[in-house]
Amino acid sequence: MRVLLLIVFAVSSMAAQANPQPLEYFLKDSDYLDVALSPSGERIAARAQFDGKVVLIVMDRETKKIIGGIQPESDDAISSFNWVNEDRLVFTYAQQFFGSDQRSSMGELYAVNFDGSDPDMLAGFRASNERAGSRLGGTRKGDRAAVSMIDILEDDEDHILIIKFPFSQQGFGYSFDGKKPPIVSKLNVNSGKQKTVERLKFRSARPLTDKNGEIRFVSYQTEDGLTKSAYRPNKKADWQLLSDAFELDDDLSVVGLNDAGNAVFLYGPHGEEGFRTVFRFDFEENIYEPLFTDLDADI
């Protein structure tokens, strides 16, 4: 089913509240949902939930004092974050829309410095920095696509790797178009500028990169709605189904690569009962084994 995405003419979630609570307000009695150290280990970033709000807090690791962060408008929430370098973080919002009981993402990426300065919407439908009524074009346009990050690119302090799932216009709105190839781009986390890396030929592709930021595996959906996975040893090589490359089941989903880059974790059915579990496949030694065995259920 194609989900219609109406154009949202609303104030961005980056806007400040009229009377925002200080970030220290969320430090006491909060539930910490995610915690991550900065690359140097000197700072701690965390999503904190208190009284229905989810904010991003940055603390000094030694003193535990709040030194920065950001909080969205009252009904929105910080849904994920990642350190890009020692000073800047990339994050996503989950927004509360009228008539909905649940927050949902608009497929947009944001960035902010650890101290809360220089917040910006980097990529997504509303990421244009063009100004209404101006004769001068902006330096970037909004993406007619849903955007998500696929690699932090640890050796590059200024860029991350993203994937864009294009929309098509339907009347006054836009909807996801599964016929258009997903676009992989390198995104500058300071300027928002993008450079296309490649276009994947797979529908609803979920790519997986190695430690060098190269896409090696991809899981995708066929026109029949089936999940398949493919592999390539490098960018110049052709994609191969898992059955052709390693004699594995094609309906396994790719979960992640190990740090060494010589083994992949896969998710799929196991045993006569068909309980789904995680497998580890060493594609250099050709060893394939489940991580969890003796699976059972009493439902």
Regions found by a protein language model. Give the residues of each.
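Hydrophobic h-region of N-terminal signal peptides that target proteins for export
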Residues: 9-17
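Sec-dependent signal peptide recognition
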Residues: 1-7
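Beta-propeller folds
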Residues: 18-299
